[in-house]
Structures are given as C-alpha cells and as structure tokens.
C-alpha cells in the first residue's frame, strides 16, 4: 500500500506540475498502402500488446444487416488457407500469449498480449487474416447459432438486457446507435457467406486499419516487420461512413420502467442530449468530461457525499459522458437507491442539486479535485499496455494523435465558467430518456 501511495503521489505531482504535451509519446509511421503504425514504448515488462484497429463498427453496418461487424469479428477467428480455425488461438496460447477482440459502434479491434520475442509471429498471423480470411457457408450457419446464444445471454437472460435495448432506441430514434452492436435476431438471420465476405472485403483493408503496439519495443524494430508482412497488401477505396443524423427530440422524454424479480434494489437513470468531441458545440467536450467527474467520478465527490453519505438517499450515484464516440450520444446520471427509499424523495433531492449547479456552477475545490483525479487516472492508463491500446481506439472515432497527446493540457485548461456553461447545455433541458429498474 505504501508503494502504491508513493507511486500515486509521484505521478500526481508529475501530471499537475508540467505541460502534458506528450503523454504517450507514440512513434508513428504510415506505409504507402495507407496502413498506420503506432508504437508506444513501455519498458516495464518484456511483453507487448498488439492491437489491429479497424475503423468500422456496427453503426457502419447496412440496415438489413446490423451487427454484421460483430459477426465478422467472430469469423476472423475461422482461419485462413494456411492457418486453420482451431489453430489460430492455439498458436498464441502455445507461445504464452492471450488474444481477444471487441466490436463497438465505431470500431473493431483485435488484441494480443505476448512476450516481445513473438511480436513478429503475431504480426504475420494478423497480416494473413487481414488479406486471406477463409470461411464456408456452413461455418456461417454454425456461427449464427453461437451469436444467437450470445444474444440470449446478453439480452433475454440478462435482468436488464431488454430494458437496455429499449433505452438505446429511446436515445437514438434514427441513428444506428439505437440498435445494439450484436444486432437483432432478424438481422443475424440475414447474414450469408456473400454478405459477410463483402463486409470483410469492404472494410478490412490496410488504409482502414491502424496497428497499435504498446510495450518493450520501438518503431525502429517494428517497422521492418510490418513492411515485410503488410507492405504488399493492396489498399482499396473505403466507403464514407454514412449514418442517419439524429433529429431533435423536440422536448420529448421517453420513460422506461421495468420490474424484474432478479433485481433487489431500485436503480434510476437519466440521459440528456450532449455534444461530443466532433459534432455540435464541441467547445463543451472537455468541460463535460470534468463535469462528469465532479458529479459521479468516485465516492469522494460532493455529489456522492450529499446524496449517499449525508442524506443517505442512495447506495451509489454516478455519471457518464459518452463524448468520445464518432457521433453524439448522451450525458447520463444514475443511482442505486437505499433500501425502502421513496423514489419521489430521491428525484426531488437530485433535481434540487442539479438546479443548484445550473444556477451557481461548481466550486473551485470541486474543479481542482476533478482535474487531479482525471490526471491521476491517466497516469496509470499510461503505464498499462492494454489500457494504452484502449486510448488509441479513439482514432477510429475521429480523434487525432495530437488530441490524445494534449488531452491532459485541455483538461488542465478547463475553467469554472466553462463547466457552468457545459452544465447548462447538457442539463437545462428535460432528459431525452429516463429508465427506472425496480424489484419484481
């Protein structure tokens, strides 16, 4: 514990005491075919985390085939002409590594963590499946069953899965963010060899991919390996990311309420329209990050102290700001109420608290503490290879490397007036959706 605290204090002093232009100090190179290489050296351990990031997510899927990006993620483990489906993961495990993948609304990433000496092996495997993925119609049919089962676990058999899907649609009437990344059953049923293969050939091309490597290596070491295996892969024309623009909800609030016997406590949620880093009043992006930290970043905030510790109205409160997405999403506030707490009493207390922020803003101490906590979190992210990969996935959502590198400077520069203005933009109107989850 003493070592943890001393490390925490060291990083806190470092982050608060100097300009942060250069958080990760990535080494960057782009091949002639458009493939970008980003290397973040980290000598803490002789391992590397390798991420192959594709700038395509389920919000880019064609309407009859929503979720096909997630399905293709599954099929990417089916092998190539030289590496069988069963062999791909076995090779990595045999060399002491681990591999995983994730598909979001805005990107798909394939990650492997392994000893540095096997870096070339992984890049060879990734280049092979970027260009030579091989699967059959029968494997498509079989994998559909796997995804149907995954959907049952996530949605039908999850206490809040269906409520979450209704919430997505309430927040996004027309935008594809309103459809869950896994898709609906009728979408999954429509997948075929042709549609999956076309999706692969459309988006999985070097000029739509970024190789991100964090760990004990350097660009000088990585570049010739990437050139050897990826350099001859041809680039292709990438379609524009065509998404429906979400219209104004014209003051409509949709309320979702669910009773579930597997839920033992009342959970309340409010979601407000908010600009993001790329669309709308983007000047509010960094102040909204700070506001979210002030409201529900951790159990030491004034917001938490008032509602949980002083008034004992809730067991927990938190906030979320989804400003990093490619298109605007929401600013959310959620709470798990104390046992036997009256919902109306809590809502009144929350409403009064938010009105106070809208009228008076937040305090200098709250601003200082929020910045300190955000920058301390960043210090520990920087030391982790996998967390570093996660940060750089924002490149698929429209961020630049410069924005990532100057993130801490932008946070440091946020003023009380900017937080107050951002709060008025996000919280003055009625929420676009609320969701109350009750015991059955």
Say what each PLM segment does.
Residues 1-4:
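Positively charged n-region of N-terminal signal peptides that target proteins for export
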């Amino acid at each position: 514990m003493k070592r943890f605290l001393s490390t925490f204090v060291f990083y806190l002093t470092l982050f608060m005491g100097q300009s942060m232009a250069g958080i990760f100090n990535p080494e960057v190179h782009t091949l002639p075919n458009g493939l970008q290489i980003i290397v973040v050296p980290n000598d803490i351990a002789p391992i590397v985390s390798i991420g192959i990031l594709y700038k395509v997510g389920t919000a880019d899927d064609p309407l009859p085939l929503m979720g096909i990006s997630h399905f293709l993620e599954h099929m990417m483990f089916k092998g190539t002409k030289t590496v069988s489906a069963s062999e791909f993961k076995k090779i990595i495990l045999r060399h002491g590594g681990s591999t995983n993948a994730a598909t979001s609304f805005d990107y798909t990433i394939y990650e492997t963590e392994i000893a540095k000496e096997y870096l070339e092996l992984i890049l060879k495997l990734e280049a092979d499946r970027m260009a030579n993925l091989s699967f059959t119609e029968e494997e498509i049919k079989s994998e559909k069953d796997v995804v149907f089962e995954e959907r049952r676990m996530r949605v039908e058999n999850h206490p809040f899965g269906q409520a979450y899907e209704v919430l997505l649609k309430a927040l996004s009437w027309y935008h594809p963010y309103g459809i869950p990344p896994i898709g609906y059953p009728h979408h999954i049923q429509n997948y075929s060899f042709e549609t999956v293969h076309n999706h692969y050939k459309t988006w999985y091309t070097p000029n739509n991919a970024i190789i991100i490597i964090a760990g004990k290596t350097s660009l000088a070491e990585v570049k010739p390996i990437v050139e050897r295996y990826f350099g001859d892969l041809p680039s292709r024309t990438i379609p524009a990311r065509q998404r429906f623009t979400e219209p104004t909800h014209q003051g409509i609030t949709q309320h979702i309420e669910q009773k579930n016997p597997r839920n033992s406590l009342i959970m309340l949620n409010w979601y407000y329209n908010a600009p993001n880093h790329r669309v709308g009043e983007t000047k509010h992006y960094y102040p909204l990050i700070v506001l979210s930290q002030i409201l529900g970043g951790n159990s030491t905030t004034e917001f938490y102290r008032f509602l949980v510790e002083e008034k004992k109205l809730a067991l927990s409160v938190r906030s979320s700001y989804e400003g990093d997405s490619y298109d605007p999403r929401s600013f959310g506030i959620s709470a798990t109420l104390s046992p036997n707490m009256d919902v109306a009493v809590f809502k009144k207390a929350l409403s009064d608290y938010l009105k106070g922020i809208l009228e008076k803003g937040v305090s200098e101490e709250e601003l200082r503490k929020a910045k300190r906590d955000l920058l301390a979190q960043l210090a520990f992210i920087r030391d982790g290879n996998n967390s570093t990969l996660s940060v750089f996935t924002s490149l698929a959502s429209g961020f630049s490397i410069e924005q990532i590198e100057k993130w801490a400077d932008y946070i440091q520069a946020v003023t009380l007036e900017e937080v107050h203005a951002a709060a008025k933009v996000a919280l003055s109107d009625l929420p676009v959706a609320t969701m109350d989850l009750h015991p059955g």
